[in-house]
């Protein structure tokens, strides 16, 4: 599967993910990039994966994507006390999701204009993905976006950034339930391949390979900057982690030759990923509401990409394990713990609410720097894993003004930003919905095909009887197609390669590519 097909496909037909067929080695290239701009490094990284967009057109997409950022460096590095903070919040919605989402939205537009196709993006968000996606595609003629968020489980600012966008192609859906409920509904909808094809559905979150790819870039820019600044030849990086897409991008950068000696995974009290890497325990618990809501997740969408590589790229094993996890079972495999981790590339830790608030207060009082709650989690855990002779790069994933109540409670300071101030008194629009796939399907159908006179079910209604679905068994395999099986996802183009499916049958992936070529873009999204 080529890059553009992978972007539009998003997921394999069975709901699985895409991974690159091969990972390029840039060990001899990145040391020459010290004087390059963010956009130049972005182009040089992406060129190894984007094989079907001409170089000059790719440069135009990149330039358009980052022209919206408020800092000319896009992702500047600030040295604060014992750590170096990579500021990823200078985009339109003040969150790290803008870095990849602006690129993805402009890539969508490029492909759809070229193919004269339309796309209906369906997504769910735990906070920042929703607003970043909405601001990325608002007003784009060939795209509609349907974005679910869990009621009462995002910050007020995050919700306002979504619901105050009134463009005709934007539909905000407020779901009774948790973010994990939203993800479950997404998987159920996108497993219905008939519905996907007939409604031209597409993905914008980190299940879409292009999102992860774009995030790889700032590990190179940030790492090169911090090594240049300190004179060191390697560095560590601490990443606030919920859905595993951000730190997975760091893992890819490491495989590509960037000298990251340790990937530090930081979670809040929703610690499923920290438990996995520390103890090998990937058992799901109840979602806990915290002051870092974008990490309030108990089922990380990108985890199966890591699992695919960890299991030796064995699709059937990944498919079997992830199916068991969806049924409420633990992982049907044991990973030995050595040196406090099941993988020497990773270290992991958790920050409680008290520890998060204490970190916010400490950095405000000691360094006059405000950290948003997610960044504070990363800094707290990162400080626990400082190397003796290596700099620690901590990813700052959101501007503190997105979480004013938490900042005020932690240190008594008002966190403000002009972008946030403009939200006050804004008109909003939002549709309440059940956490049910049939309700979501009906709303999408009524919106796209209004002449059929079907209405969305109100909250409290009984879900409609399920319709027949056409999904592909993750454990199936096939030969003779352009894609081959990977577990519960698929392989996307990289270094001139075609795409491969993690858990979807190869023939099914090939069929999806064919459908895409006929103006039917299929995929899925979670945040």
Show where each model-derived region lies.
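Terminal export/targeting leaders at protein ends
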Residues: 464-469
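Membrane-penetrating hydrophobic segments
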Residues: 487-504
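PLP-dependent amino-acid enzyme catalytic core
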Residues: 1-460
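Short, glycine/alanine-rich hydrophobic alpha-helices that insert into or span membranes
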Residues: 500-515
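Extended hydrophobic/Leu-rich segments
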Residues: 457-459, 493, 527
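Membrane-proximal, acidic/low-complexity disordered segments on the non-cytosolic side
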Residues: 515-517, 521-527
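C-terminal low-complexity, Ser/Thr- and acidic/Pro-rich disordered "stalk" regions positioned immediately N-terminal
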Residues: 470-491
């Amino acid at each position: 599967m080529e890059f553009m097909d992978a972007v539009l496909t998003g997921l394999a037909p069975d709901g699985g993910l895409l991974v690159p067929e091969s990972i390029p080695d840039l060990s001899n290239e990145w040391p020459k990039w010290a004087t390059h701009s963010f956009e130049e490094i972005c182009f040089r990284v992406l060129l190894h994966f984007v094989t079907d967009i001409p170089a000059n057109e790719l440069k135009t997409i990149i330039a358009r994507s980052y022209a919206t950022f408020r800092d000319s460096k896009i992702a500047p590095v600030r040295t604060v006390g014992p750590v170096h903070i990579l500021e990823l919040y200078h985009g339109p919605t003040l969150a790290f999701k803008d870095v990849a989402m602006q690129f993805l939205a402009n890539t969508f537009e490029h492909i759809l204009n070229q193919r004269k196709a339309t796309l209906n993006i369906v997504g769910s968000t735990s906070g920042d993905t929703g607003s970043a996606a909405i601001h990325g595609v608002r007003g784009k003629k060939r795209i509609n976006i349907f974005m679910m968020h869990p009621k009462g489980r995002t910050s007020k600012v995050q919700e306002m950034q979504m619901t105050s966008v009134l463009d005709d192609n934007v539909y905000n859906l407020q779901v009774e339930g948790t973010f994990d409920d939203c993800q479950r509904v997404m998987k159920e909808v996108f497993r219905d391949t008939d519905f996907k094809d007939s409604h031209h559905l597409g993905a914008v979150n980190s299940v879409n390979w292009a999102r992860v790819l774009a995030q790889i870039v700032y590990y190179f820019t940030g790492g090169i900057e911090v090594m240049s600044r300190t004179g060191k030849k390697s560095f560590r990086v601490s990443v606030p982690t919920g859905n595993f897409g951000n730190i997975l991008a760091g893992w890819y950068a490491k495989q590509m030759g960037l000298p990251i000696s340790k990937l530090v995974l930081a979670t809040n009290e929703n610690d499923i990923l920290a438990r996995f890497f520390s103890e090998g325990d990937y058992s799901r618990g109840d979602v806990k509401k915290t002051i870092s809501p974008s990490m309030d997740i108990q089922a990380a969408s990108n985890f199966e990409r890591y699992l695919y590589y960890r299991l030796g790229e064995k699709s059937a094993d990944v498919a079997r394990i992830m199916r068991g996890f969806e049924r409420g079972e633990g992982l049907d495999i044991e990973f030995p713990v050595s040196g406090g981790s099941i993988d020497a590339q990773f270290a992991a830790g958790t920050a409680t609410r008290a520890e998060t608030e204490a970190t916010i207060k400490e950095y405000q009082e000691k360094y006059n720097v405000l950290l948003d709650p997610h960044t504070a989690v990363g800094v707290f855990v990162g400080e626990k894993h400082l190397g003796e002779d290596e700099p620690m790069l901590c990813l700052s994933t959101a501007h503190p003004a997105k979480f004013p109540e938490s900042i005020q409670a932690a240190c008594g300071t008002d966190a403000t930003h002009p972008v946030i101030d403009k939200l006050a008194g804004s008109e909003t629009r939002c549709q309440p919905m059940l956490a049910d796939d049939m309700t979501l399907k009906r709303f999408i159908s009524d919106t796209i095909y209004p002449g059929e006179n079907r209405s969305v079910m109100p909250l409290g209604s009984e879900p409609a009887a399920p319709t027949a679905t056409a999904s592909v068994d993750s454990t199936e395999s096939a030969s003779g197609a352009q894609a081959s099986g990977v577990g519960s996802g698929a392989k996307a183009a990289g270094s001139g390669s075609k795409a491969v499916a993690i858990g979807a049958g190869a023939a099914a992936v090939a069929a999806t590519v064919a459908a895409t070529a006929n103006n039917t873009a299929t995929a899925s999204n979670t945040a």
